[in-house]
Amino acid sequence: MSESVHTNTSLWSKGMKAVIVAQFLSAFGDNALLFATLALLKAQFYPEWSQPILQMVFVGAYILLAPFVGQVADSFAKGRVMMFANGLKLLGAASICFGINPFLGYTLVGVGAAAYSPAKYGILGELTTGSKLVKANGLMEASAIAAILLGSVAGGVLADWHVLVALAACALAYGGAVVANIYIPKLAARPGQSWNLINMTRSFLNACTSLWCNGETRFSLVGASLFWGAGVTLRFLLVLWVPVALGITDNATPTYLNAMVAIGIVVGAGAAAKLVTLETVSRCMPAGILIGVVVLIFSLQHELLPAYALLMLIGVLGGFFVVPLNALLQERGKKSVGAGNAIAVQNLGENSAMLLMLGIYSLAVMVGIPVVPIGIGFGALFALAITALWIWQRRH
């Protein structure tokens, strides 16, 4: 294991390979665990509106810890922070396996994920620089989405076989991620910062203000937040849409449909890495608008094959849209507030959007609005929101 403090800027350095492997296993566990736990809720006869609540407690951990996790990522070697965070995920998954309340166990996984995210993205700026940063983001997103593809399917398929087996597979994936983290080089950190919680909160709010007052980073924050809020809501919408629109009631089919989105995002992320630079980020905006349009069209489908094709298209558009926004925020944020703090602020925005959208979706399901009209309204509103963001960006 290398302990070098020097950065090897090669896109395929030993450290970068370890980051990608750890990211894949951790994201695999996250996505398999979601569908395995949803199957557990279904088996234990929880109400349908409680399904998005599961994700809400997960993202709630992100929001509550947002003022602190960025400084943690910047104050310690990011590879070690990632290892600790994956250990928390392992503990959360294991607790669900052993019969602890699934909402409590999933909250613990959320705490681990909150600590993990600033470190996993912040380390990219330490392992590579300049023009390779967008490509590194493309690799990171491709790894994550490949994990979403395989993890989602594995979670659903294994849960149809036996829920406990699915949960155990998630714990095993997190354990593998912990091992992979050991091989990430121990790069220089920024120790010596205050650990007073009030001061940390104030510092985080200052970072929020700094990024929000910069037009480029504000644009990136809003765009990425809208995308990920919509993405997680679509995932839960599919769980209810499949039996209504397609008449299929198993756990696996929604995961197959989610996998189509994942495949598309891998393609879109690769295209963005080749076609978009930090100077041409606005090229991604038409793709964002089209996401909403295609979601609207998708909601009206009643056949499986068109549903697969449209969801893959949504993924392609999504990958092309979000990868340049992530790279822009990391590059500008690293120079102003530190990479870890920049990603922590991004997480706050994204997870606040998720919490809001999931809350609205859960409320809509609770009051009895049919899932197809929910999907139509969701797609239309997303397209309008991205259009408004693009108009604002061009004017400023």
Curated annotation (Swiss-Prot):
InterPro entries documented for this protein: LysoPLipid__transptr_LplT, MFS, MFS_trans_sf
Positions in the Cytoplasmic compartment: 39-52, 112-144, 188-225, 277-279, 325-342, 387-396
Superkingdom of source: Bacteria
Alphabetic keyword roster: Cell inner membrane, Cell membrane, Lipid transport, Membrane, Transmembrane, Transmembrane helix, Transport
Pfam families listed in its UniProt record: MFS_1
GO molecular function, one term: lysophospholipid:sodium symporter activity
Subcellular location: Cell inner membrane
CDD domains linked: MFS_MefA_like
Similarity comment: Belongs to the major facilitator superfamily. LplT (TC 2.A.1.42) family.
NCBIfam families found in the cross-reference section: PRK11195.1
Protein name: Lysophospholipid transporter LplT
Gene of this entry: lplT
